[in-house]
Regions:
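Terminal interaction-prone segments of large eukaryotic proteins
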Residues: 1-146
């Protein structure tokens, strides 16, 4: 590519061609050594692996988005049969953080979030590499859904 500045890398070419038509959906995955599973799978388990957090912006402010994992989606980008390139995306339900009756409360030690209302329903996707794993516990001091 140094000899020919107009040449495009194999990776960029594969991405520009778009993903393959087949998409793989999974109930769980392991990203950077961290195990994630969809929230529907946790109904039958004692462990919790669906809590996710990612950094983003809302109304021109940087915030942390908190949610639960709904789907693990693996897209394949192949420009030839020898190379298998995949991108893993998470579809999440993001908890609404606006308003006085719902939102996020931070006491300096723990963050408490109201879990009965969602937002960004039309923008639910993040790259799996952007996710940070978090755990949710019921906060009895604020009542139901906190």
């Amino acid at each position: 590519m140094k000899d020919n500045p107009e040449a495009v890398s194999e990776r960029l070419w594969a991405l520009s061609c778009g993903p393959c038509l087949r998409v793989k959906f999974s109930a769980a995955c392991k990203i950077n050594g961290v195990r994630y599973s969809i929230v529907d799978q946790e109904k039958f388990m004692l462990t919790q692996n669906s809590g996710v957090m990612t950094e983003g912006s809302h109304n021109d402010q940087d915030i942390d988005f908190y949610g639960v994992l709904k789907e693990v989606i693996e897209l394949q980008y192949n420009s030839n049969l020898q190379a298998r390139r995949t991108v893993v995306q998470f579809r999440c339900d993001w908890f609404n953080q606006e308003g006085k009756t719902r939102g996020l409360r931070d006491d300096g030690h723990f963050k408490t979030i109201h879990i009965s209302s969602y937002w960004y329903k039309t923008d639910p996707f993040i790259l799996a590499s952007q996710a940070k794993k978090i755990f949710y516990l019921q906060d009895t001091s604020f009542g139901k859904d906190w």
